[in-house]
Amino acid sequence: MFNSFGNIFRLTSFGESHGKGIGGVIDGFPAGIVIDEEFVQQELSRRRPGQSVITTSRKEADKVEFLSGIFEGKSTGCPIGFIVWNENQHSNDYNNLEKVYRPSHADYTYTVKYGIRDHRGGGRSSARETISRVVGGALAKLALRQLGIHITAYTSQVGPIKLEGNYTDYDLDLIETNPVRCPDPEKAKEMQDLIYKIKGEGDTIGGVLTCVIKGCPIGLGQPVYGKLHAALGNAMLSINAAKAFEYGDGFKGLKQKGSEQNDVFYNNNGRIETRTNHSGGIQGGISNGQDIFFRVAFKPVATVLMEQETVNIDGIDTTLKARGRHDPCVLPRAVPIVEAMAAMTILDYYLLDRMTQL
């Protein structure tokens, strides 16, 4: 259950980290959208492993194969099926995990819940599942482009190293110029050096991604239980290793008074706008036409290459030292995943909004 995401635009994903492949079926995608398969592949390449010295060394082409729902380069309105074949599994790296539980992983909870688990690379709980999300998000981005909606995410903090400014203070075109995907070149170098150092110690580190949605029309959101920020929060917190979500000023706004936090309205040549955007583009659970921006915190990767205490499947105390190929920090590869989940959420809520009035 619960392997599907969305209401009208709906992605159902399938597959495991060391199975034959990862795939999905997308229902509710509008007909007539030009499908740029090269763009979809580029998005997957941003997520794939082995991009740099600060990511996992697992080598996968992650080539997407579309199976249905596209004809002569356009969506038909029928379900879009796709698959990405796994090619570089090293399942033997996980033989020592068959009868022990990795600290802070899903091993124990999956075993208790289902009575069985795939110990090879985490199985269904692996972040490799997010391949399906990136494909779905890439298709959603293609549709949103036609509406003038654009989504950009970037690394804004790694461990103690953080960007102090708002997204408006940076040139977001610089995000893809460094492996950390940070728009501040100096901070990016510091972040990269820290990740590399942590990797050398066999440890991991977390941080924060910031995401900005520009061009979102007024009116997206379905109060009271389908508020737009709640939907975005649900989408982000469904990503592996995501631990917290805040939009607008978030917790920072608690330090101010209401008179300081309020986004006052004014008439800008016939268009009602706000002079500030503390609300993060959402008021009353509905988009107000301003930029939507939010932050997602990711914990350090649970797999560390050092000995740790744990228990085996019989509940007996033991120790475990992980092997295999793992990310020392998820943030660089999580950037396209955050964008994908945001894109699918916005497209879904755009389609829902078309049902609000006759």
UniProtKB/Swiss-Prot annotation:
PROSITE patterns from the UniProt entry: CHORISMATE_SYNTHASE_1 (PS00787), CHORISMATE_SYNTHASE_2 (PS00788), CHORISMATE_SYNTHASE_3 (PS00789)
One of the record's GO cellular component terms: cytosol
Pfam families (alphabetical): Chorismate_synt
Positions of FMN binding: R124, S125, S126, N240, A241, G284, K299, P300, V301, A302, T303, R325
GO biological process, alphabetically ordered: amino acid biosynthetic process; aromatic amino acid family biosynthetic process; chorismate biosynthetic process
SUPFAM superfamilies in alphabetical order: Chorismate synthase, AroC (SSF103263)
Cofactor field: FMNH2
Pathway it works in: Metabolic intermediate biosynthesis; chorismate biosynthesis; chorismate from D-erythrose 4-phosphate and phosphoenolpyruvate: step 7/7
Keywords tagged on the record: Amino-acid biosynthesis, Aromatic amino acid biosynthesis, FAD, Flavoprotein, FMN, Lyase, NADP
Molecular-function annotations in GO: chorismate synthase activity; FMN binding
EC number: 4.2.3.5
Catalytic activity field: 5-O-(1-carboxyvinyl)-3-phosphoshikimate = chorismate + phosphate
Record's cofactor remark: Reduced FMN (FMNH(2)).
InterPro entries: Chorismate_synth, Chorismate_synth_AroC_sf, Chorismate_synthase_CS
Residues annotated to bind NADP(+): R47
Database matches in CDD domains: Chorismate_synthase
Oligomeric and partner information: Homotetramer.
Function: This reaction introduces a second double bond into the aromatic ring system.
PANTHER family per UniProt: CHORISMATE SYNTHASE
Family to which the UniProt record says this protein belongs: Belongs to the chorismate synthase family.
Protein's name according to its UniProt entry: Chorismate synthase
Annotated gene: aroC
